[in-house]
Amino acid sequence: MKTPLLDIPASYKEILADVQKNINQVISSGQFILGPIVEELEQKVATYCDAKYAVGVSSGTDALLISLMAAGVGEGDEVITTPFTFFSTAGSIARLGALPVFIDIEKETFNIDPNQIEKKITN
């Protein structure tokens, strides 16, 4: 049996009608980037996160890349991450010329093991 890496239709089956309605609204407006619909989303996300700003981007990969850039990550830097993640995590780090430093996960939580972080820091 072939298992897909990402099964988008199955992941949003319950909200399909609402998603299609909103996609049609965006297409009808002719504003695929920026515009009032994106601004409204950004304001709602900022409010929900109790943040001053939120920026809509085209993908999770872009979100990771912009976050790393905002943090000042660049050539030769080391960024601690987990190998138990989507490949864009390490890819975004490497794209900026930085080095992903992998730390294993905790068996109980599947999150990065904080007890291993300090010994991986090199400077």
Residue ranges and their predicted role:
Residues 69-123:
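PLP-dependent aminotransferase-like
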